[in-house]
């Protein structure tokens, strides 16, 4: 007889199986462990373990229409498709980036709200979100039982950002051309840049997507950063005429291999241009591009997830958190605070600045040492004043790439620790 615990496991296995295409590595690992349990318990359960699943939503969206076409009579819901990084929140109860399958940590309150929306309709396959400038907006909701409008209303009541949408009855065959596209796009009337329009005919599940645009090439004068939050900066690509080309995040910049004083391919919309999301031309490896872009942005910044952050006092905050002492705003305050604790003072004395700084940032030791062994440092008065990576091949390791993107912060913390050691023990 099947126990209640077994039924719980089987229900979870079924739920994970249905949302595999939207799963991250943790969910896949959980799924595989349940498959292994089910196979050993029941011998045959009808599903198999998987190695990796690329996040895809192609079953729910038709091919993009980029030329005028006739739209049939009927009742339609039109939705904006926003510029930004696309994420899927599904029954696996995790936020997964479309295409890469990478999971993304969201605030607990947002996760709770997403779960409430999912729990309110068993027919929801997934919620589609867009992240731009560190802001989330729910872009679509796929349900077998109801239109996205009803789900948007519920999500809005819970405090999520939802799109403006348009409900229209089309009474006769109508040409969907640039003029109609522009009318619908303007009706959405919000501040998020829109790259296309999707629509659903009443009674149908699949979305149709319309994207009228032109390709162009623009000359890049500079690569800068724009502040979008508390110590959060997004890459900004500026043309020779001073216009700004929209960039999703740091990875978008890297993939496109943008370089100052060269031309880049863009998608031109009515009111803005988008950095074309493709693996840019040229022979540069990803590692070489990362090095060049970080050098261009400058040593005052480090890669912080999808964006940049300024080194500033962030190192002091992380160091005080690691040492479990009161927050300090200057090195003088830090020295005074350390002197209050014999345990902390002994830790500073016995542990190298190198190891303490690495631990403070949580870098894996083996990957960190591999990176450092491929770098050359300029040291003055025991502090790092400059560094250069001599072999970018090691950046093919995603973990090492992350550490390198964050390395300016490591240098800041290392120099603080070095300064503190001098003041305490010399």
Curated annotation (Swiss-Prot):
The keyword Phosphoprotein applies. Interacts with the DNA polymerase catalytic subunit OPG071. Interacts with UDG/OPG116. Component of the uracil-DNA glycosylase(UDG)-OPG148-polymerase complex; OPG148 and UDG form a heterodimeric processivity factor that associates with OPG071 to form the processive polymerase holoenzyme. Interacts with OPG117. Keywords: DNA replication, Phosphoprotein. This is DNA polymerase processivity factor component OPG148. InterPro entries: Chordopox_A20R (IPR010267). It holds the Pfam family Chordopox_A20R. Belongs to the orthopoxvirus OPG148 family. Plays an essential role in viral DNA replication by acting as the polymerase processivity factor together with protein OPG116. Serves as a bridge which links the DNA polymerase OPG071 and the uracil DNA glycosylase. GO terms for biological process: DNA replication.
């Amino acid at each position: 007889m099947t126990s209640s615990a077994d039924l719980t496991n089987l229900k979870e296995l079924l739920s994970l199986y249905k949302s595999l295409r939207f799963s991250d590595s943790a969910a896949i690992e959980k799924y595989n462990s349940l498959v292994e349990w089910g196979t050993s318990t029941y011998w045959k359960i009808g599903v198999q373990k998987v190695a990796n699943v690329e996040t895809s939503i192609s079953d729910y969206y038709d091919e993009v229409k980029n030329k005028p076409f006739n739209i049939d009579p009927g009742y339609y819901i039109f939705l904006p498709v926003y510029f930004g990084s696309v994420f899927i929140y599904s029954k696996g109860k995790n936020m997964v980036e479309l295409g890469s399958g990478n999971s993304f940590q969201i605030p607990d309150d947002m996760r709770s709200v997403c779960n409430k929306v999912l729990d309110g309709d068993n027919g929801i396959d997934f919620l589609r979100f867009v992240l731009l400038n560190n802001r989330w907006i729910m872009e679509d909701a796929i349900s077998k039982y109801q239109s996205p409008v009803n789900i948007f209303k519920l999500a809005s009541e819970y405090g999520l950002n939802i799109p403006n949408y348009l409900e229209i009855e089309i009474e006769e065959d109508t040409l969907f051309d640039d003029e109609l596209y522009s009318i619908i796009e303007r009706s959405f009337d919000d501040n998020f840049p829109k790259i296309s329009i999707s629509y659903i005919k009443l009674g149908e599940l699949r979305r149709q997507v319309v994207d009228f645009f032109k390709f162009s090439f623009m000359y890049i004068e500079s690569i800068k950063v724009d502040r979008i939050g508390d110590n959060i900066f997004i890459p900004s690509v500026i043309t020779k005429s001073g216009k700004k080309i929209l960039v999703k995040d740091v990875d978008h910049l890297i993939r496109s291999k943008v370089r100052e004083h060269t031309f880049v391919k863009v998608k031109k919309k009515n009111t803005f241009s988008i950095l074309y999301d493709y693996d840019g031309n040229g022979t540069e490896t990803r590692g070489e591009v990362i090095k060049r872009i970080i050098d261009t942005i400058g040593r005052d910044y480090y890669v912080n997830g999808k964006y940049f952050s300024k080194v500033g006092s962030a190192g002091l905050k992380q160091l005080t958190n690691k040492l479990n002492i009161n927050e300090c705003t200057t090195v003088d305050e830090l020295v005074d605070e350390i002197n209050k604790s014999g345990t902390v003072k002994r830790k500073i004395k016995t542990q190298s600045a190198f190891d303490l700084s690495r631990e403070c940032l949580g870098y894996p030791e083996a990957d960190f040492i591999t990176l450092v062994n491929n770098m050359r440092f300029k040291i003055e008065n025991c502090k790092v004043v400059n560094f250069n990576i001599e072999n970018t091949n090691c950046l093919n390791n995603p973990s090492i790439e992350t550490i390198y993107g964050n390395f300016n912060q490591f240098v800041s913390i290392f120099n603080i620790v070095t300064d503190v050691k001098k003041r305490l023990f010399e």
